[in-house]
Regions:
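Conserved PLP-binding active-site segment of the aspartate aminotransferase-like
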Residues: 209, 375-388, 402-437
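PLP-dependent enzyme catalytic core of the Aspartate aminotransferase-like
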Residues: 232, 414-467
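Short Gly/Ser/Thr- and Asp/Glu-enriched loop/turn motifs at secondary-structure junctions
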Residues: 115-116, 153, 369-376, 415-419, ...
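Active-site C-terminal subdomain of aminotransferase-like
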Residues: 255-374, 380-385
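Conserved PLP-enzyme active-site core in the AAT-like
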Residues: 2, 9-15, 124-300, 308
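Conserved PLP-binding catalytic core of the aspartate aminotransferase-like
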Residues: 365-402, 463-465
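N-terminal entrance/gating region of PLP-dependent enzymes' catalytic architecture
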Residues: 1-116, 402-405, 420, 465-467
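A common structural junction motif
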Residues: 398-406, 441-448
Length: 467
């Protein structure tokens, strides 16, 4: 083909190398919408470059959230991103897969066969906790009115340990509930069951038991809590119930410690939430909540919505969202089965125990949680340790190798205790764990041989290190 002077394809940008493009040679607008479009390959690279200096998700040992899924799961989820989970009349088979997931969880959590359990997916455990809390509040209100209690006299209250996740504080603020916090202490790094009933009155909507405290990974003694609640209920017209926040533990414990009584086997446990994107092994974000029986989910919280040609019951706080995470959850259930989950979680537990030994052998730390119940390794510096550096400095050292390992104070009455914690997930294999252990030992060596630089006129409450 012949071309004239005007046909030199000077506007054919595919001939221009990406890093020679006009977009790459000028500053992109960051807080206003740019005027002209650009090629997708250039937009992709620009966005990718903006994220380049972030941490590697696989090395983020601060998060419980899943950072790896199989390629087949990723393909399946990418193919279903456009499906709206709320459009159940348009995507009936997707709704069926969600229903299957609810039934699988009900079986895992030992829902009684003679009761009518029900449940739903959520965006994550935070939404699930909101729904669980709302169900308790509305049920308390209905029962209180029947008893003739003046529900306007004071605010209803919820009882939980100081190891709560922030979603519970949000719930109490959003829905005008008084959060009564049972403080943890050095002897009780989970809920102190003996102190719980110091906080109970007729305005208590329920008690939250935590299966995997975010700070430490420890479990509340839910079986003992259930015993105490049963004693209370036998002698009081006001009936207490227990909600289990199993964001971390409810998709782990059934596989590695199935004999532990914490779930619907306990009489007063009426609802359970979990995060599918934690030990359910799905990318963020999907959560689940189940109620033991329909009597524990007040009817006024269930809405019949006419949408896109069909009527459907819904109670979620969120509405439109992709169904891909629900489908990813069902893929995992189908792919792994009980034995697959058990093998994965047992391996993760083994990794946690190995790393806990590494921490302990260093001689610097007291282990708070060794990963035996939940693969969370948590520790603090020994009380008699005489060193200049802190756990915050150790966190900085590990970050230099890409590892994100948080250090932070415990809540409330233990706020003077600084701890460090790392989460072992399914994608932390033994070989990678060995690399982390080596970096951990190197970090300690560097801290011991660092020259301390004091700041603020010689005071040593703020300092750094040179190497």
């Amino acid at each position: 083909m012949l071309y004239s002077e005007n046909d030199k394809r000077k506007h054919e940008s595919y001939r221009i190398p990406l890093f020679g493009s006009e977009e790459e040679s000028t500053s992109i607008p960051k807080y206003v919408l740019k005027k002209e479009p650009m090629e997708p390959r250039i937009a992709y690279q620009l966005v990718k470059d903006q994220l380049m200096d972030e941490g590697n998700a696989r090395q983020n040992l601060a998060t419980f959230c899943q950072t790896y899924m199989e390629k087949e799961a990723e393909i399946l989820m990418s193919e279903t991103l456009a499906k709206n989970a709320i459009d159940k009349s348009e995507y009936p088979q997707t709704a069926e897969l969600e229903n299957r997931c609810v039934n699988i969880l009900a079986d895992l959590w030992n829902a009684p066969k003679d009761m009518s359990y029900l449940g739903t997916s959520t965006v994550g455990s935070s939404e699930a906790c909101m729904l669980g809390g709302l169900a308790m509040k509305f049920r308390w209100r209905n029962n209180a009115e029947k008893r003739g209690l003046d529900i306007q006299a004071k605010r209803p209250n919820l009882i939980i340990s100081s190891g709560y996740q922030v979603c519970w504080e949000k719930f109490c603020v959003y829905w005008d509930v008084d959060m009564r916090v049972v403080p943890m202490d050095k002897e009780h790094l989970s809920i102190d069951v003996d102190k719980v009933f110091d906080f109970v009155d007729e305005y208590t909507i329920g008690i939250v038991g935590i299966l995997g405290i975010t700070y430490t990974g420890k479990f509340d003694d839910i079986a003992l809590l259930d015993e105490k609640v049963e004693i209370y209920n036998e002698t009081n017209e006001h009936q207490l119930v227990i909600h289990i926040d199993g964001a971390s533990g409810a998709m782990f414990t059934p596989f590695v410690n199935p004999e532990l009584p914490w779930d619907f086997r306990l009489k007063n446990v009426v609802s359970i939430n979990t995060s599918g994107h934690k030990y359910g092994l799905v990318y963020p974000g999907v959560g689940w909540i189940l109620w033991k029986d329909k009597e524990y989910l007040p009817k006024e919280l269930i809405f019949e919505v006419s949408y896109l040609g069909g009527s459907m019951p819904t109670m979620a706080i969120n509405f439109s969202r992709s169904a891909s995470q629900i489908i990813g959850q069902y893929y995992n259930f189908l792919r792994y089965g009980f034995e697959g989950y058990r093998e994965i979680h047992e391996k993760t537990k083994k990794t946690a125990l190995y790393l806990a030994k590494t921490v302990e052998k260093s001689g610097y730390f007291e282990i708070i949680n060794d990963g035996a119940n939940l693969p969370i390794v948590c520790y603090k510096m020994k009380d008699d340790l005489d060193v200049e550096w802190t756990l915050y400095d150790l966190a900085d050292q590990l970050l230099m190798k890409g590892w994100q390992v948080p250090a932070y104070p415990l809540p409330d009455d233990l706020s003077d205790t600084i701890i460090q914690r790392f989460v072992c997930r399914a994608d932390l294999g033994h070989n990678v764990a060995e690399e982390f252990a080596a970096d951990f030992r190197d970090a300690l060596h560097n801290l011991e041989h660092a020259r301390v630089l004091y700041h603020d006129k010689g005071r040593n409450d703020s300092y750094g290190f040179t190497h």
